[in-house]
Regions:
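N-terminal targeting/trafficking signals and adjacent low-complexity tails
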Residues: 2-4, 70, 100, 145-146
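Glycine-rich P-loop/Walker A and Walker A-like loops and their local beta1-loop-alpha1 context
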Residues: 1-29, 33-35
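N-terminal phosphate/diphosphate-binding loop that engages ATP/GTP or pyrophosphate donors
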Residues: 24-72
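Glycine-rich, charge-decorated loop segments at or immediately adjacent to ligand/cofactor-binding or catalytic sites
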Residues: 139-153
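A charged, well-structured terminal subsegment
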Residues: 157-173
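Short Gly/Thr/Asp-enriched flexible loops that form oxyanion-binding sites at enzyme active sites
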Residues: 114-124
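Substrate-engagement module of ASCE P-loop NTPases
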Residues: 123-139
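Helix-adjacent hinge/juxtasegments
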Residues: 58-99
Length: 173
């Protein structure tokens, strides 16, 4: 592993429990680390069916509803991402960069970011500012992530046991 200020936490598309990033951010905050960024929270009904996705700002707890699929979206498996809500979520990353947090944890390198949209500008700004960044990247998009990041960042397993030692190698500033 080369020493860099950013890393992709690579996960398989079928990974059922993606709580490791949220748990890592909670651990860091408990240790007094200033954490910025966003985590996705999948909302489910009583039967376990997805009813939406919220982005949660790690510094404020603000919830931003980025996805509320209709019955038709679910039946036709069409995208129901609210791109204006996604745009609203960029403020959490801009704030983290502006405030110079100790680390940014981000659970978002989805379709919009893969197209160079969504949170892409803020992700690249965090890297340029050398703020440690841990970002969830789906396995199928890893090559694109590496291309966009100049293949300079680390690639980690999506696991606390991979995040912790990486964190020990990076410092902001």
């Amino acid at each position: 592993m080369i020493e860099t200020t950013f890393a992709a936490a690579m996960y398989a598309r079928d990974l059922a429990d993606r709580g490791a990033l949220s748990e890592f951010a909670t651990e860091l905050r408990a240790a007094g680390v200033r954490v910025g960024g966003l985590i996705q929270e999948v909302l489910r009904d009583d039967d376990g069916k997805m009813t939406g996705i919220d982005m949660v700002a790690l510094d404020t707890g603000q919830r931003i509803a980025i996805n509320r699929p209709t019955k038709e979206n679910l039946e036709n498996k069409t995208c129901s991402l609210d791109t204006s809500a996604l745009t609203d979520s960029t403020e959490a990353l801009r704030r983290a960069i502006r405030e110079g947090v100790d680390i940014i944890v981000l659970e978002k390198f989805g379709e919009q970011e893969q197209k160079g949209q969504g949170l892409n500008d803020e992700i690249l700004a965090a890297i340029a500012e050398e703020i440690p960044l841990l970002i969830a990247v789906p396995e199928f998009a890893l090559a694109l992530w590496q291309e966009r990041s100049g293949a300079l960042g680390d690639t980690l397993a999506y696991d606390l046991d991979a995040f912790r030692p990486w964190r020990g190698t990076v410092q902001h500033g």
